[in-house]
């Protein structure tokens, strides 16, 4: 005999919510589904191009790959530490 009550609750009219608006209904195991992008505002379907900066991902990319404004500052610091190491090292004198 199969076990009873092992399946999650099914909501045939689950609401899909984007930016506070109900954009569609579907069947799901959750009563509400919150999304950032759906076909009504996705750049591919609307023909527009925009950057979706969710949680600062663009800024993180810029920092990670050295495209931020502080790139020159960090390279200057590296140069000064390397110069210091060279000047502090003992010289070989015979």
Swiss-Prot record:
Region (Disordered): 65-94
Entry GO CC: ribonucleoprotein complex; ribosome
GO MF terms held by the record: rRNA binding; structural constituent of ribosome
Tagged with keyword DNA-binding: no
Family membership noted in the UniProt record: Belongs to the bacterial ribosomal protein bL31 family. Type A subfamily.
Basic and acidic residues composition-biased segments: 74-94
GO biological process per UniProt: translation
Subunit text: Part of the 50S ribosomal subunit.
Superkingdom, natural source: Bacteria
Function: Binds the 23S rRNA.
Gene3D superfamilies in the cross-refs: Ribosomal protein L31
Record keywords, A-Z: Ribonucleoprotein, Ribosomal protein, RNA-binding, rRNA-binding
Protein name: Large ribosomal subunit protein bL31
Lineage of producing organism: Bacteria, Bacillati, Cyanobacteriota, Cyanophyceae, Synechococcales
Organism: Prochlorococcus marinus (strain MIT 9211)
């Amino acid at each position: 005999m199969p076990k009873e009550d092992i399946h999650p609750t099914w909501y045939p009219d689950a609401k899909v919510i984007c930016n506070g608006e109900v954009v569609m209904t579907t069947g799901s195991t959750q009563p509400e589904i919150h999304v950032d992008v759906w076909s009504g505002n996705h750049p591919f379907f609307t023909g527009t191009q925009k950057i979706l900066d969710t949680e600062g991902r663009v800024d993180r990319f810029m920092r990670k790959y050295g495209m931020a404004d502080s790139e020159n500052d960090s390279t200057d610091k590296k140069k000064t530490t390397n110069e210091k190491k060279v000047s502090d090292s003992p010289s070989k004198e015979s």
